């Protein structure tokens, strides 16, 4: 019986020594919060700020579809945007800006 108690005590000591979690593993900030916040999410990606990127952006702005231009115009006008929430952007653009082109 005495040998059994000694073996159980020895097993508990071995288990405590091997299963102990050190503080070094908790020092990392990723341990508590592994996700990046929105401000740091794209911080490690380089922006393409060269002349080619600027030209491509200007080409994209110049070649917008008419529906996209109408939607942007409608988004800038508060009443049109509110109307668009209920009836859609094409109907809102026609309601507020469609008659102006015919004059």
Curated annotation (Swiss-Prot):
Location(s), subcellular: Secreted
Tissue: In 16-day-old embryo, expressed at high level in the sternum and tibia, at low level in skeletal muscle, heart and gizzard. Not present in skin, liver and brain.
Entry function: Associates with the organic matrix of bone and cartilage. Thought to act as an inhibitor of bone formation.
Source taxonomy: Eukaryota, Metazoa, Chordata, Craniata, Vertebrata
SMART domains xref list: GLA
InterPro entries on file: GLA-like_dom_SF (IPR035972), GLA_domain (IPR000294), MGP (IPR027118)
Any GO MF annotation of the entry: calcium ion binding
Protein name from the UniProt record: Matrix Gla protein
Superkingdom per UniProt: Eukaryota
UniProt keyword list: Chondrogenesis, Developmental protein, Differentiation, Disulfide bond, Gamma-carboxyglutamic acid, Osteogenesis, Phosphoprotein, Secreted, Signal
Gla domain: residues covered: 52-98
PTM notes: Requires vitamin K-dependent gamma-carboxylation for its function.
Record-level GO BP terms: cartilage development; cell differentiation; ossification
4-carboxyglutamate found at: 21, 57, 61, 68, 72
SUPFAM superfamilies for the chain: GLA-domain
